[in-house]
């Protein structure tokens, strides 16, 4: 009889004596998590006239790692058991923030794995200014309608409107500028109840009086009721 030793790596799975010429029966390899037994190498059909060492080996199993975003499959990869997992880069979606991957193990287990992520919609800041004055500042959800505020009344001026207001909120903060135009009012000069001259004057402008009219044999009294600057009325 001779010795038949069956090993996997340095581990002896079985060691037994077998009579010369008898059939050599290999043992069943023990189960190993995440691996498949690849078989015994060069097992003789019958026992030779010397001791033998028969080597066996395992192959590493691959398992499926599936990434899902908002319930839909994003990517699927095959990963060897026990491999350290490097997460897929976060997907990008304009106007949204990705939550990160949930359920991602550090190393690949001996089973298929599904990891999930979700997008949440962002809000951005919409600031409405006239000059240096902030009229309104508010958070607006990406893609929602941008509603401009009503501009405050300003004496002697007409609001000219907000410039370049987007229809819907973009994926960034915005500053929207507004402006006023100066109103014109009518300055009417009357002499002895009859209209002498009428001019259009911007609100707030310093008024320079019309030269005194002349009439032979008469003295002009001067202009009464003439303001220093043009008020917000005729």
Regions found by a protein language model. Give the residues of each.
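Surface-exposed interfaces of beta-sheet-rich extracellular modules
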Residues: 23-47, 83-108, 145-169, 206-232
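Short coil/turn motif common to extracellular beta-sandwich-like domains
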Residues: 2, 20-24, 49-51, 62, ...
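Residues marking helix boundaries in flexible regions
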Residues: 9, 14, 53, 86, ...
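Conserved "repeat-terminator" motif of extracellular CCP/Sushi domains
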Residues: 1-2, 6, 30-31, 44-63, ...
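Short, solvent-exposed loop/edge segments of extracellular or virion-exposed proteins
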Residues: 4-20, 66-82, 127-142, 188-204, ...
């Amino acid at each position: 009889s001779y010795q038949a030793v069956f090993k996997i790596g340095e581990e002896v799975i079985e060691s037994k004596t077998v009579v010369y010429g008898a059939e050599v029966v290999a043992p069943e390899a023990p189960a190993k998590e995440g691996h498949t037994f690849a078989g015994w190498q060069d097992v003789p059909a019958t026992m030779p006239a010397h001791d033998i060492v028969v080597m066996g080996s395992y192959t590493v199993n691959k398992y499926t790692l599936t990434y899902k975003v908002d319930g839909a499959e994003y990517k699927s990869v095959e990963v060897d058991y026990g491999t350290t997992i490097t997460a897929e880069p976060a997907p990008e979606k304009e106007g949204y923030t990705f939550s990160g991957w949930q359920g991602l193990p550090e190393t690949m287990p001996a089973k298929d794995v599904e990891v999930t992520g979700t997008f949440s919609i962002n809000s951005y800041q919409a600031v409405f200014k006239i000059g240096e004055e902030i009229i309104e500042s508010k958070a607006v959800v990406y893609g929602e309608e941008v509603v401009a505020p009503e501009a405050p009344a300003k004496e002697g001026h007409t609001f000219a409107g907000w410039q370049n207001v987007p229809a819907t909120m973009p994926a960034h903060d915005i500053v929207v500028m507004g402006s006023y135009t100066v109103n014109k009012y009518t300055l009417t000069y009357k002499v002895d109840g009859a209209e002498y001259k009428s001019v259009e004057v911007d609100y707030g402008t310093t008024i320079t009086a019309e030269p005194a009219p002349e009439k032979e044999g008469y003295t002009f009294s001067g202009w009464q009721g003439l303001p220093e600057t043009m008020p917000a009325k005729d």
